[in-house]
UniProtKB/Swiss-Prot annotation:
Matches recorded under Pfam families: ADH_N, ADH_zinc_N
Family per record: Belongs to the zinc-containing alcohol dehydrogenase family.
Originating organism: Pinus radiata (Monterey pine)
Listed InterPro entries: ADH-like_C (IPR013149), ADH-like_N (IPR013154), ADH_Zn_CS (IPR002328), CAD-like (IPR047109), GroES-like_sf (IPR011032), NAD(P)-bd_dom_sf (IPR036291), PKS_ER (IPR020843)
Source organism phylogeny: Eukaryota, Viridiplantae, Streptophyta, Embryophyta, Tracheophyta
Protein name, per record: Probable cinnamyl alcohol dehydrogenase
Amino acid sequence: MGSLETEKTVTGYAARDSSGHLSPYTYNLRKKGPEDVIVKVIYCGICHSDLVQMRNEMGMSHYPMVPGHEVVGIVTEIGSEVKKFKVGEHVGVGCIVGSCRSCGNCNQSMEQYCSKRIWTYNDVNHDGTPTQGGFASSMVVDQMFVVRIPENLPLEQAAPLLCAGVTVFSPMKHFAMTEPGKKCGILGLGGVGHMGVKIAKAFGLHVTVISSSDKKKEEAMEVLGADAYLVSKDTEKMMEAAESLDYIMDTIPVAHPLEPYLALLKTNGKLVMLGVVPEPLHFVTPLLILGRRSIAGSFIGSMEETQETLDFCAEKKVSSMIEVVGLDYINTAMERLEKNDVRYRFVVDVAGSKLDN
């Protein structure tokens, strides 16, 4: 996409090495193409995978790196061929900003599974420039990978839906886990897990939160609306709950045993893995074959599903529980996130941090 546009200089917060420490970084946006929009960032959520990328835990990180893939902002400029958006509209950008558009996955509106997908940051654009994320004052994004924020959805509330929200919404729709009255377990109560509780309840499911301790029980039941709470270390209660759940959404992003949770599934039950776990996970096959249970995986969602997630949450008045912080607090927020010291998602007030002043 050639363009006569000049490059725009912006400021963001970048990691320079695997220490993951973020500090101010000035760089040029790629030139705006005919199908691009320029988005002034207002809010950006913090995801656990940001920590993974910043610290090179997957061995694929490149620096300087500006993280952030739960981006909410306002369109300030549009390319000559942009039909989807107008200047002044509130929009969102999630985990990917490009794909090949010609493979089987792309042709079926499953861009997130395209082998040539382009990550929102720590990747390379089609023109060879590095992608940088939402911890910055502005971004240039292809209109195909931008979604519209519903007018009745608060902007700061929309940010976590662009990753955490669609991560649970997509498998629930794909695997038909939306029948009212069915019993759904949510394993792990962090940023993704708390959205799982809220979205599952909005679909009319009976929701059981499964956690390693009872620290979050009162909040899960009284604030998030869960119907039941199960402590995974309570062997007696886990045995009593055997074969009681139709589905489990496993949101835990670190290595953990699967056997205790597979035992909770009914015959034909399904455990869907949502967390990025770099270490091997182990289980014994009789837990699967003697109950025709299955383990599946799901990765974020398509652009269509992302828009559907936003519209669904706006209609059902599903809100995320967030703590809004400034960019000057970003490193402390990352440290707290690593310790699970957040209820339940940090959202950075990027515009309020006045990066370009």
